[in-house]
């Protein structure tokens, strides 16, 4: 980055310091990951210069013959990864992928059944402060209070009562496997469409480690980062059942409906990431993500930290801090101060406000990319517990900092940057 260093020292320094943060801290935010240098090279390429409104072979600009190749490669690889008949890789984010589906099949005020945000859902699944909750009439389903798992019978009853046009499955803070087949059965019973937002688990689905929603859902949306380990972006997929009826409508909803020109440098980076995800090495990586999450959860429980639902089936864990008399806000700050990055997160039936919360969410995708295994999960679990139990003990916290530094030095990040 010699040109940037000379031309804009302020931005260069911000990037340099962020690289240092990623190298020196243990990244446990469940929605984050470390992409390959090949993905970063594609995203930082000359494709950022090219406007390409439209779709391959149907552009509103000339000179698109090479960006067409990149987009076709991305679409073909995504179809292969997930067994989809239709793919749109142009959404700039997961939120815009969701918006594209909503705009395709819903009218203002239509009823939609989605997961309660505090039970693990997402802002775009009907939060009243989000466009989804403003534009449409969302009703909520959630988890049982006793075991914190989705209550499918309650989902069925809510669907029968409210007769939604669309049911949304998928979550941003739900640590258990979701039964998409059961969701489709419920949708069929009430004549609703089913959309699955698999943003958090897409990499696990691609590796065959979680039920694939594509055969069951009318529409599947995802981000391309998180467990899929690509650039930040979104994507829509459909199976053969709905591709013929809705493919062109979905394309029009994205462009010209809610977006203009696609980000061709990001789409190229998506293509690279999808190629990586097709490899045997990625399958091994995804298996390790889950093994690490399970091991970390077991260690935290052994250290006396409560885990929502008692464990995990995927990459994330939700910690209930009430028994430690801590809030998520306090815990996030304390952990960050010793070099462990997490995020405060509401737990089901949380008595605290959304900016305070009673929990923190952690995930293992990024640390697994770094090379951490189950032995490192034991140490991280111990370090988290030590921190949470000794928030005012500076001697104990300094010991944690030293151990974090030793651990991160053992597994260097981006040594060539």
From Swiss-Prot:
CDD domains: SHMT. Its EC number is 2.1.2.1. (6S)-5,6,7,8-tetrahydrofolate binds at residues 117, 121-123. Its main location: cytoplasm. One of its GO terms (biological process) is glycine biosynthetic process from serine. It holds the Pfam family SHMT. Gene3D superfamilies: Aspartate Aminotransferase, domain 1 (3.90.1150.10), Type I PLP-dependent aspartate aminotransferase-like (Major domain) (3.40.640.10). GO terms for molecular function: glycine hydroxymethyltransferase activity; pyridoxal phosphate binding. Its cofactor is pyridoxal 5'-phosphate. The modification N6-(pyridoxal phosphate)lysine is found at residue 226. Pathway: One-carbon metabolism; tetrahydrofolate interconversion; Amino-acid biosynthesis; glycine biosynthesis; glycine from L-serine: step 1/1. It is found in: Cytoplasm. It catalyses: (6R)-5,10-methylene-5,6,7,8-tetrahydrofolate + glycine + H2O = (6S)-5,6,7,8-tetrahydrofolate + L-serine. It comes from the Bacteria. The record marks 225 as: Plays an important role in substrate specificity. Keywords: Amino-acid biosynthesis, Cytoplasm, One-carbon metabolism, Pyridoxal phosphate, Transferase. GO terms for cellular component: cytosol. Homodimer. Catalyzes the reversible interconversion of serine and glycine with tetrahydrofolate (THF) serving as the one-carbon carrier. This reaction serves as the major source of one-carbon groups required for the biosynthesis of purines, thymidylate, methionine, and other important biomolecules. Also exhibits THF-independent aldolase activity toward beta-hydroxyamino acids, producing glycine and aldehydes, via a retro-aldol mechanism. Belongs to the SHMT family. This is Serine hydroxymethyltransferase. The gene is glyA.
């Amino acid at each position: 980055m010699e040109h940037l260093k000379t031309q804009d020292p302020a931005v260069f320094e911000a990037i340099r310091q962020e690289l240092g943060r990623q190298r020196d801290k243990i990244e446990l935010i469940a929605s984050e990951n470390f992409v390959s240098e090949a993905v970063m090279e594609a995203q930082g390429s000359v494709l950022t210069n090219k406007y390409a409104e439209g779709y391959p072979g149907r552009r509103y600009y000339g000179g698109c013959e090479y960006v067409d190749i990149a987009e076709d490669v991305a679409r073909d690889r995504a179809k292969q990864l997930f067994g989809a008949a239709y793919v749109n890789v142009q959404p700039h984010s997961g939120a815009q992928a969701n918006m594209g589906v909503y705009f395709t099949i819903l009218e203002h005020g239509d009823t939609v059944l989605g997961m309660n945000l505090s039970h693990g859902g997402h802002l775009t699944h009907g939060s009243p402060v989000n466009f989804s909750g403003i534009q449409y009439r969302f009703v909520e389903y959630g988890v049982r209070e006793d075991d914190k798992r989705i209550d499918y019978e309650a989902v069925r009853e809510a669907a029968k009562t409210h007769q939604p046009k669309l049911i949304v499955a998928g979550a941003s803070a739900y640590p258990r496997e979701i039964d998409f087949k059961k969701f489709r059965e419920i949708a069929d019973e009430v004549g609703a469409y089913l959309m699955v937002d698999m943003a958090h688990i897409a990499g696990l689905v691609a590796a065959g480690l979680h039920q694939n929603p594509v055969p069951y859902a009318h529409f599947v949306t995802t981000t391309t980062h998180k467990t899929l380990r690509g650039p930040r972006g979104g994507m829509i997929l459909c199976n053969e059942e709905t591709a013929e009826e809705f493919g062109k409508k979905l394309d029009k909803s994205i462009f010209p409906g809610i977006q203009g020109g696609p980000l061709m440098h990001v789409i190229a980076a998506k293509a690279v990431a999808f190629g990586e995800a097709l490899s045997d090495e990625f399958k091994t990586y995804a298996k390790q993500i889950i093994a690490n999450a399970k091991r970390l959860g077991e260690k935290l429980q052994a250290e006396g930290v409560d885990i929502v639902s008692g464990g995990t089936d995927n990459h994330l864990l939700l910690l209930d801090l009430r028994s430690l008399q801590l809030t998520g806000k306090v815990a996030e700050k304390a952990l960050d101060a010793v070099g462990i990055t997490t995020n405060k997160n509401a737990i089901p039936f949380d008595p605290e406000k959304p900016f305070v919360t009673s929990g923190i969410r952690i995930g293992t995708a990024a640390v697994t990319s770094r090379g951490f295994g189950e032995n490192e999960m034991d140490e991280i679990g111990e370090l988290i517990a030590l921190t949470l139990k000794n928030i005012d003990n500076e001697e104990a916290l300094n010991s944690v900092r030293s151990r974090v530094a030793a651990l991160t030095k053992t597994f260097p990040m981006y040594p060539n940057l």
